[in-house]
Amino acid sequence: MGVYQDLAHWIYEGFYAAGAAPTPAEYFVVPQQGLPPAGKPSTNVIRSPGFAYNPCMRILLFSGKGGVGKTSLASATGLRLADLGYRTLVMSIDPAHSLADSFDLDVELFQVQTSDPFPIQDGLSIFELNIQKEIKRHWQQISSYVISVLRTTGISDVEAEELAILPGMEELSAMMYINQYRRENSYDVIVLDAAPTAESMRFISMPTTLDWYMKHIFPFQRNLLKAVRPIANRVAPIELPTDSYFANIRDLFEKLEGVDEIIEDPHTTSVRLVTNPEKMVLRETQRAFVYFSLHGLTVDNVIVNRVLPPEIRDAWFNEWHNSQDHVSRELEEYFAPVPVRFVPLFAREVLGKQRLQELAKVLYAEAEDPAAVTRTEKPYVFGKQDGMYEVRLRLPFATKGDIGLFKKGNELVVEIGTLRRHIGLPRSMATLVPSRARLENRLLTVEMKEPQ
């Protein structure tokens, strides 16, 4: 099991533990009003040389605590967008898929999980990743090697195939499809039905951690194994990974190139946090807001789902009303100036197109475009004030005691609780070190100076 443990350790260290970020994207986006007409590329995006993608596609990421209603709201948003004429894909990145259930697809349930978009109506498809099929499409060499290692331990082929699903495979597969659809101009809007908060953080951090792995670990692993393989294969109980294994990793990385720029571009990607008017869920939503901000994503809406309608009044429900009213006021205060929307609790379960369209009418105003770009404020910026270089990060809900700072190479590392974010510094600041930090009005300002 030693080689397999080493392999799992490499994957874990590269994909999970690094938490690193590349240097900021060498491109910028000029603010635009809404989206260009479907199928017509925008002309106001300036990109780094050699990186080409469809600049007019929007990504709406619905995230929140498990069970708050993300899938229903994402599905309703997809229906509204399709009715407005957008080529829309609602894509589940939650391992526990429920998109098919949301649209009440009984006969088609098992057809949906084919790793191909499933049409719902003109302009709308849904997509539930089937990880077994994704392994055959994208991870064949990696999976085959892991299975061969596991077989040497005496476990059955079926068990080996199950255990060969390594952490991060599903998230990276979803990222590859997002990148592919963007480059091929397949859709105008992709609505992502995300996993609960912790898994969502793993999803958005995957491209940057993979980038770190490819720069710092991959070349060393490949060259070392290439040198020792002829001797090691004579004495080791199993063969070491071949060149095709590393070629598979390189191919995956190339398919993901540029996806981090897509995810962190506020004119492309917006996060919509879904919550319920309950104190425990509110705390989770606050943490999610901080984590998304720390990763460079823009939250443009907070949606409070399942609010008790005012007409439901009796002695038993009064306490619930008082509690929800209190939490709702806190929500509006905490998240200002981010808009907070309130969606009432429906009389029965929201299932099927008709009920989802009713939900969409409550969620969005009649003339409202859910794909419109409404907030583009970046969570962190670089600047210069009174001759002093600064890094400014918007960190709502964080306190001074929560935050840790240190410099590593040409990166500024910010820690909040168990989360770590590596912020690549521009060349003009790469040699500087943090000298002082202050947290005022939800804004962390880190002053940088030359080392002594």
Give a label for each model feature.
Residues 27, 33, 41:
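Cationic, low-complexity basic patches in intrinsically disordered or flexible, solvent-exposed regions
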Residues 50, 253-400, 413, 418-420, ...:
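C-terminal lobe/tail of nucleotide-utilizing enzymes
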Residues 56-68, 72-257:
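Nucleotide-state-sensitive switch-loop elements of NTP-binding domains
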Residues 384, 407-408, 439:
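Generic beta-strand structural signal
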Residues 401, 430-450:
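Beta-rich strand-turn-strand
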